[in-house]
Amino acid sequence: EPTFLQTTEIYLGAPEAPRVTLTCHDWIGGTPPWNQHMVRAALGYRQKNSGRKKQAVEDVKQAASGSFWAVKVVEGGKYTFELRRWPTEANKPLVSSLPAGAAVPGSSKAFRETPGEAIPIVSAGVRITDYVNSTFHKVLVGKDSPSVRMSLSLQPGSYELAPFFETKDGKEVGAYYCIVTGPEQP
């Protein structure tokens, strides 16, 4: 019987889907940025979210609270994690802002009309835990890089996957997008 008490896992490593794009809309914990207005406004990093009249305490704490994706690794092996601030289609550096998009005629304010806020990212990392053991990997970010990639070997099983960016002021914010590819074939 369906229930919200049971976490739904996103499968990684299935032969039918060797590449999976995870979006912050599916974060567990805190208040996930569930639309493009929130992504553009850097929800999870900013101390104030001007897009809402009342700010939930969770919004401020999100970056430190450890938002994650619940994933299930189907096949063990080496996986590549590509962390992004902006979607692939935007093709913008991790640290860049985005201009506001054009209005949509005949509609209320479109999400794309919100300017994309830059986040001063200096490094990126991945935390992954299988509820017993944790793995942590962190790398520096190039100023003009649209993404950062890192690889980890994983065994089949259930995990909490928490890719993140670290800012020059020492704050962390979850990676808004994470493209997982794998496992590598020999």
What residue spans do the PLM features occupy?
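Extracytoplasmic
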Residues: 1-186
